[in-house]
């Protein structure tokens, strides 16, 4: 177990039983919610999911809620956002190398990358399908990290360079998270807003 700058512990999560798979499949959905807190309670009370993280309207990304039915295995399976532009479908790959290969496939196919982020819990990139629906492809880091969180990265860097960025993030004293919504620093780090 490792502690973040607030003294909270990171715990390892199960990443994937077969790390050789290019595309594991659909892993979570990010959906628009008028009131993420209220909708999260519905999914908790009716569907039995656990609320694993959230932010309120004061966060630069707006109000959000993250839920999982298996929080030890998946950091979240549903993400709810008050900002409709953050709605997406997320597909998991089995390794950082696979993420980089998939990234090159998308770029090589002439599809514009919208975002490249380190979320703490994952490395990810985003693009749109032909009808404008946002798609996320990600590789989970195996760490728990407060969400929402997005730090711009460059997926053309080597795996070693990207892992150094992850290591630097976990030791950073002034990170951006749901409990530290430093708007200026968030915007400086190329937020999704």
What are these language model-derived features?
Residues 12-17, 22, 35, 64-66, ...:
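Residue-level detector of functional hotspots within protein domains
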Residues 6-7, 15, 50-87, 93, ...:
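Conserved short beta-strand elements that form part of the metal-binding/catalytic scaffold
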Residues 20-24, 30-74, 191-192:
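Core segments of cupin and vicinal oxygen chelate
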Residues 1-20, 26-34, 80-107, 109-193:
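Vicinal oxygen chelate
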């Amino acid at each position: 177990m490792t502690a973040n700058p607030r003294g909270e512990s990171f715990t390892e999560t199960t990443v994937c039983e077969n790390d050789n798979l290019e595309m594991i499949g659909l892993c979570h959905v990010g959906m628009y919610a008028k009131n993420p807190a209220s909708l999260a309670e519905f999914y908790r009370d009716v569907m039995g999911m656990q609320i694993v993280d959230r932010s309120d309207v004061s966060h630069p990304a707006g109000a959000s809620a993250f839920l999982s039915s298996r929080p030890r295995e998946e950091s979240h399976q549903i993400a709810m956002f008050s900002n409709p532009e953050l709605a997406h479908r997320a597909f998991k790959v089995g390794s950082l190398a696979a993420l980089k290969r998939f990234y090159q496939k998308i770029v090589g196919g002439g599809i514009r990358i919208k975002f490249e982020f380190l979320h703490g819990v994952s490395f990810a990139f985003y693009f749109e399908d032909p009808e404008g629906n946002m798609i996320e492809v990600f590789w989970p880091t195996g760490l728990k990290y407060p969400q929402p969180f997005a730090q711009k990265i460059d997926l053309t860097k080597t795996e070693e360079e990207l892992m150094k960025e992850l290591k630097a993030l976990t030791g950073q004293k002034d990170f951006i998270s749901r409990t530290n919504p430093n708007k200026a620093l968030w915007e400086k780090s190329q937020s999704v807003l």
